[in-house]
């Protein structure tokens, strides 16, 4: 079943990034992720209670008992938003390195090197393209996230905001990471989304496992490059090259 095959890519990706030849391409984005994580968590710890109070609806006294039921939902909602912010910022900053990591993983998996050799000049040349692609992801993400954020403030409706955020987050994890190998092969944005939709259940399986792994503090720092490697395996084994427009 596709939904069951998707999660295995993350575990295999974790094994791949432990190989000596890939460690250099893991250490650089890992260091970036660590810095972003430390800064964001420090800020979030100071503001966490305020954010939960801001999102929590005001209940009349006779419904006060419901506060203890809905409070965990809003704590989870804040955690999900913090998670999204960290993932988005870290991936934007480390995008060129993630692109190179995806290239090298594909070389290992396929056993042949169809990409230019690594050089700092090549990395610098990738920055405009990868940043442009990250901005395209941001343009896809922000309007949908804004709708969910507005729903989070609507009394009653905000009770379903958390599960909607989670489902959207699972899909975005697939989009975020599988786009690295797709972009390396110059697959257009709309074509990439169409291909992912054709693999919807496998994508949700991979995205769901990635989502869960990235929610775990500190573990998520290692799992981000593992997700890049796993997404590259997904691209190769699910025959992503067939989506390329010749």
UniProtKB/Swiss-Prot annotation:
One of its GO terms (cellular component) is plasma membrane. The keyword Magnesium does not apply. One of its GO terms (molecular function) is high-affinity sulfate:proton symporter activity. GO terms for biological process: cysteine biosynthetic process; sulfate assimilation. Signal peptide: none annotated. It is found in: Cell inner membrane. The chain crosses the membrane at residues 24-44, 69-89, 148-168, 214-234. It comes from the Bacteria. It holds the Pfam family EI24. Keywords: Amino-acid biosynthesis, Cell inner membrane, Cell membrane, Cysteine biosynthesis, Membrane, Sulfate transport, Transmembrane, Transmembrane helix, Transport. It is a multi-pass membrane protein. PANTHER family: SULFATE TRANSPORTER CYSZ. Belongs to the CysZ family. High affinity, high specificity proton-dependent sulfate transporter, which mediates sulfate uptake. Provides the sulfur source for the cysteine synthesis pathway. This is Sulfate transporter CysZ. It comes from Pseudomonas paraeruginosa (strain DSM 24068 / PA7).
């Amino acid at each position: 079943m596709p939904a069951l095959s998707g999660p295995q890519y993350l575990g295999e990706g974790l094994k791949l990034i432990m190989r000596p030849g890939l460690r250099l391409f893991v250490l650089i984005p890992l260091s970036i992720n660590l810095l972003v994580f430390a800064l964001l968590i420090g800020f979030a710890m100071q503001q966490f209670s305020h954010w939960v109070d801001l999102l929590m609806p005001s209940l009349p006294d006779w419904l006060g008992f419901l506060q203890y039921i809905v409070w965990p939902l809003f704590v989870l909602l804040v955690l999900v938003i913090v998670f999204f912010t960290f993932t988005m910022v870290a991936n934007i900053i480390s995008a060129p390195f993630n692109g190179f990591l995806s290239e090298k993983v594909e070389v290992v998996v396929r056993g042949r090197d169809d990409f230019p050799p690594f050089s700092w000049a090549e990395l610098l040349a990738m920055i405009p393209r990868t940043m442009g692609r990250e901005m395209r992801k941001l343009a896809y993400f922000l309007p949908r996230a804004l709708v969910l954020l507005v729903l989070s403030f609507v009394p009653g409706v905000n009770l379903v905001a958390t599960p909607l955020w989670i489902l959207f987050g699972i899909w975005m994890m697939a989009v975020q990471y599988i786009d690295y190998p797709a972009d390396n092969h110059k697959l257009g944005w709309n074509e990439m989304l169409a291909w992912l939709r054709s693999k919807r259940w496998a994508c949700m399986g991979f995205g769901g496992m990635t989502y869960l792994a990235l929610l775990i503090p500190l573990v998520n720092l290692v799992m981000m490059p593992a997700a890049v490697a796993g997404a590259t395996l997904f691209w190769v084994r699910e025959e992503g090259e067939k989506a390329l427009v010749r």
